[in-house]
């Protein structure tokens, strides 16, 4: 079985070395590592050149991460395709675990591993030889996927901790990733149309958070997730079975409600109410409708009687200098 690793690289001079080193230090090495320089204007091309004997390098004018991923998927030859962003890090056993999951669950269309957040531009130190081991493994049916995704989006929101069998991309279409600021969530949701996914809770990926990252703004993130559902709605209506479509619609309504809370917390009541009204139309489920209408009523109460709405900004835990 052949494994391909795909790494988009854009203006990542401060992190790309540690990212590529984490790939090259795997206990079960990748068969090919494809790196695309997406029109970087910093020292990234020079750094990548120093790895040319160990990875396959490509370069193009800046077209965005979705385009890069689609290009690299088309060029990959592995049976299992692994993705890694240019600022995240893998535990040395990451590919070893993913290969085993692939062999144990040939019916699965994606394999996610657990991750841990870390802050700034520094390195992440894995704790001891036993780190990255253990955890539970779940096979999540397509019908249950949106329930899990809606309850905790984080485990499925980044492809740095996801591997996908190459055969699956033939079912997803020519452009499984779309440029919108939520490329991972778009492709992730598409996978539910194809089959079950596997989740291994062992923390095998270090996901880097930086102060300037848009992912620190939950309001922006939820807005992107709502947009993903808007783009996918027609495709699910046309191709999903009744039960999967219902699960998708309930998740869509729930994401709108979560987004509405954040809009209220950032002083945008008109936009929040628009989301809640749309959420009523997203799902015919009576409980979902009742939740949306109840929240809509709360937005019209005098401010002292309203709940404490979340503001949506992640509290920064790193150094102020990064």
Residue ranges and their predicted role:
Residues 11-25, 32:
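Short, well-formed alpha-helical segments that are part of the catalytic scaffolds
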Residues 14-17, 40-50, 89, 93:
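Acidic helix N-cap motif at the loop->helix transition within catalytic regions
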Residues 22, 29, 37-46, 63, ...:
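A conserved acidic beta->alpha catalytic loop
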Residues 74, 132-225:
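Conserved nucleotide-sugar donor-binding catalytic segment
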Residues 148-156, 180, 186, 193, ...:
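C-terminal subregions of glycosyltransferases and related glycan-biosynthesis enzymes
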């Amino acid at each position: 079985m052949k494994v391909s690793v795909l790494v988009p690289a854009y203006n990542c001079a401060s992190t790309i070395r540690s990212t590529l080193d984490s790939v090259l230090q795997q206990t079960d090495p990748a068969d090919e590592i494809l790196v695309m320089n997406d029109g970087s204007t910093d020292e990234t091309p020079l750094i990548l050149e120093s790895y040319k004997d160990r990875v396959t390098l490509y370069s193009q004018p800046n077209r965005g991460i979705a385009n890069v991923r689609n290009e690299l998927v088309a060029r990959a030859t592995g049976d299992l395709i692994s993705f890694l962003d240019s600022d995240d890090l893998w535990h040395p056993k990451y590919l070893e675990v993913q290969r085993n999951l692939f062999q144990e669950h040939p019916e699965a269309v994606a394999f996610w591993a657990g991750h841990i957040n870390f802050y700034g531009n520094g390195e992440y130190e894995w704790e001891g030889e036993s780190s990255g081991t253990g955890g539970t493994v779940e096979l999540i049916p397509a019908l249950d996927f949106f329930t899990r995704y809606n309850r905790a989006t984080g485990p499925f929101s980044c492809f740095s901790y996801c591997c996908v069998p190459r055969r699956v991309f033939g079912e997803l279409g020519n452009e499984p990733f779309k440029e919108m600021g939520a490329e991972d969530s778009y492709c992730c949701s598409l996978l539910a149309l194809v089959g079950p996914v596997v989740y291994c809770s062992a923390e095998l990926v270090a996901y880097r958070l930086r102060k300037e990252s848009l992912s620190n703004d939950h309001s922006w993130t939820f807005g992107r997730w709502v947009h993903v559902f808007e783009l996918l709605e027609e495709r699910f209506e046309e191709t999903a079975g009744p039960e999967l479509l219902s699960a998708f619609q309930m998740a869509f309504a729930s994401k709108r409600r979560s987004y509405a809370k954040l809009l209220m917390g950032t002083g945008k009541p008109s936009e929040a109410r628009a989301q809640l009204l749309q959420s009523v139309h997203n799902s015919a489920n009576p409980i979902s409708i009742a939740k949306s209408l109840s929240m809509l009523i709360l937005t019209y109460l005098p401010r002292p009687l309203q709940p404490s709405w979340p503001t949506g900004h992640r509290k920064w835990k790193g150094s102020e200098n990064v």
